[in-house]
Amino acid sequence: MAKAATIKIKLLSTADTGFFYVTKKNSRTMTNKMSKRKYDPVVKRHVEFKETKIK
């Protein structure tokens, strides 16, 4: 069987609240770590979320 192109990743808040989003990314086209600016409801503002592995 072929290796799947998309993998699940966890986007963890850099505000150290422990809040995270789970999303998918194409591991063949996006080889770098993903980071997005999204809403963190714990601090009630948009912050940077960085990619970590799902444990």
From Swiss-Prot:
BP terms from Gene Ontology: translation
InterPro entries: Ribosomal_bL33, Ribosomal_bL33_CS, Ribosomal_bL33_sf, Ribosomal_zn-bd
GO molecular function: structural constituent of ribosome
SUPFAM superfamilies: Zn-binding ribosomal proteins
Keywords: Ribonucleoprotein, Ribosomal protein
GO cellular component: cytosolic large ribosomal subunit
Keyword Ribosomal protein: yes
PANTHER family: 54S RIBOSOMAL PROTEIN L39, MITOCHONDRIAL (PTHR15238), LARGE RIBOSOMAL SUBUNIT PROTEIN BL33M (PTHR15238:SF1)
HAMAP family with a match to the protein in the record: Ribosomal_bL33
UniProt xrefs under NCBIfam families: PRK00595.1 (NF001860), rpmG_bact (TIGR01023)
Family from the record: Belongs to the bacterial ribosomal protein bL33 family.
Protein name: Large ribosomal subunit protein bL33
Protein's organism: Bartonella quintana (strain Toulouse) (Rochalimaea quintana)
Lineage, highest ranks first: Bacteria, Pseudomonadati, Pseudomonadota, Alphaproteobacteria, Hyphomicrobiales
